[in-house]
Amino acid sequence: MAANLPNMRSIRRVMGVDPGLTRCGIGVVDGYPGLARLVGVDVLHTPADAELGDRLAALEDGLVQWLDRAAPDVVAVERVFSQHNVRTVMGTAQAGAVALLVAARRGVPVVWHTPSEVKAAVTGQGRAGKDQVAFMVRRLLRAPGLAAPADATDALALAICQLWRGAAMARLAAGGAR
Amino acid sequence: MAANLPNMRSIRRVMGVDPGLTRCGIGVVDGYPGLARLVGVDVLHTPADAELGDRLAALEDGLVQWLDRAAPDVVAVERVFSQHNVRTVMGTAQAGAVALLVAARRGVPVVWHTPSEVKAAVTGQGRAGKDQVAFMVRRLLRAPGLAAPADATDALALAICQLWRGAAMARLAAGGAR
């Protein structure tokens, strides 16, 4: 049925952000449910021995460059519900706040996905391991040789998750059949 | 002894920030150990039903206005070590990140104090209650009629704590007697 063919207008660009102070993963993909193309990938680093404010400012600079360069339709950020280490939660929250802030300043909508939503979207299993997520990201993007650390493949998985789920949620919101 | 007289050059202006998304307390004081003068106090509100990114952007606007207007020598922020509610920790961390970011962008140093350090500085007791902190803030600032909510008096207490402790830490760092 024609209604099931992907429409060119439905192609979206998503920038996934795996927030972190020491390593912040960035992954940009284009596509629609079932097809994702790699646009760009990066890991922003800030030195652990620098002042926290300077680290956040450096992170802001990097995120602004990526937002302006990639011009995504939407930014997808990992939603952290609970972690054992309060220090890690704080760093993740602080880095995530900067991503949110720069996206809001540019009028780019931000969506959130939990780690299990992301894992389920790319592997079919909400408790998949890091290696399996990285393997499936490379397969889905048809980039088997992609050299990228886990923070980067996690950000790409977030972006792919939004391509898949975002469209499904939009259909549900519009009252369409699934 | 002359060495114990406060030196005009030691007068510092501190802006205390009690970070929060729904209510962010701001308190600015001038002084030196033993004397604190109220400069300004405010609570920044952001609507709980707004997008998180827009809330952070509104908070940034308010903090920038206060930083530019008050021109503090240093910003003191509450250091959160642990809270039971992860959602509250995240909001505090996100709001604190914005305060850090805007201070770093303007080259204003940021210092951290734990709630118990703040309580001990203004009441002599690290486990003092909110009412006791608010009472002592009004007494120390000689502003018994100050109408300000707890978020604002907490921010003032943070600023006073930095006036007291900051000088002591600077003396210790310089190798002087306590």
From Swiss-Prot, chains A, B:
The active site is at residues 18, 78, 151. Mg(2+) 2 binds at residue 78. The keyword ATP-binding does not apply. Its cofactor is Mg(2+). Keywords: Cytoplasm, DNA damage, DNA recombination, DNA repair, DNA-binding, Endonuclease, Hydrolase, Magnesium, Metal-binding, Nuclease. It comes from the Bacteria. InterPro entries: RNaseH-like_sf (IPR012337), RNaseH_sf (IPR036397), X-over_junc_endoDNase_Mg_BS (IPR020563), X-over_junc_endoDNase_RuvC (IPR002176). Its EC number is 3.1.21.10. It is found in: Cytoplasm. Binds 2 Mg(2+) ion per subunit. The RuvA-RuvB-RuvC complex processes Holliday junction (HJ) DNA during genetic recombination and DNA repair. Endonuclease that resolves HJ intermediates. Cleaves cruciform DNA by making single-stranded nicks across the HJ at symmetrical positions within the homologous arms, yielding a 5'-phosphate and a 3'-hydroxyl group; requires a central core of homology in the junction. The consensus cleavage sequence is 5'-(A/T)TT(C/G)-3'. Cleavage occurs on the 3'-side of the TT dinucleotide at the point of strand exchange. HAMAP family: RuvC (MF_00034). This is Crossover junction endodeoxyribonuclease RuvC. It comes from Acidothermus cellulolyticus (strain ATCC 43068 / DSM 8971 / 11B).
